[in-house]
Regions:
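Alpha-helical transmembrane segments and their membrane-interface boundaries
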Residues: 1-64, 111-116, 126-139
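Hydrophobic transmembrane alpha-helices of secondary-active transporters
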Residues: 18-23, 74-81, 103
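Small-residue-rich segments of transmembrane alpha-helices in multi-pass membrane proteins
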Residues: 41-51, 72-75, 94-108
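Alpha-helical transmembrane-segment detector that highlights a single hydrophobic TM helix
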Residues: 59-85
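Alpha-helical transmembrane segments and their membrane-interface exit regions
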Residues: 72-78, 120-130
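Hydrophobic alpha-helical membrane segments of integral membrane proteins
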Residues: 89-94, 112-117
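Amphipathic alpha-helical interface segments
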Residues: 98-100, 118-121
Length: 139
């Protein structure tokens, strides 16, 4: 028989896959860096580290959470490119950073919060993209 924790962990991993897909889909359809696969991996990795941080016992959950943020920040730094006076990849870095936080939310069992935040993130990216498009047209 399957241990109850494994069912819970599997549900969390599946939800983090869905969260990564939701966030990565917008990036993918607009041909931006860090699309569906990358966001899924970031969400799942953060979820697994979060699950492990509280399931091991005797471990400071805050320290592992801080290390997730540090690791993701290192990954995000690799997406930022400076070309002469232009800086590219800041939004990609921000999206990966937020996706990691959503994966952590799922890992810690905050499903509703994670999905509401993912929806609001998508809405924000959509609205800002439309505003930027209108602004460019006026120029």
């Amino acid at each position: 028989m399957i241990e109850t924790n494994y069912i819970e962990y599997s549900i969390k991993i599946l939800c983090s896959i869905l969260i990564g897909f939701i966030v990565g889909f917008e990036r993918q359809i607009h041909s931006h860096d860090a699309g569906i696969k990358t966001n899924i991996l970031v969400a799942v990795g953060s979820c697994i580290f979060s699950i492990m941080s509280y399931s091991i016992g005797g471990v400071d959950v805050g320290r592992i959470s801080a290390q997730i943020v540090t690791g993701i920040s290192f990954l995000c730094a690799g997406t930022i490119v400076k070309e002469k006076t232009n800086i590219r990849g800041l939004t990609t870095a921000g999206v990966l950073w937020v996706t990691a936080s959503l994966g952590m939310c799922i890992g810690f069992g905050k499903f509703g919060f994670a999905f509401i935040a993912a929806g609001l993130i998508q809405l924000t990216l959509f609205i800002i993209q439309r505003i930027e498009h209108l602004w460019r047209k006026k120029k």
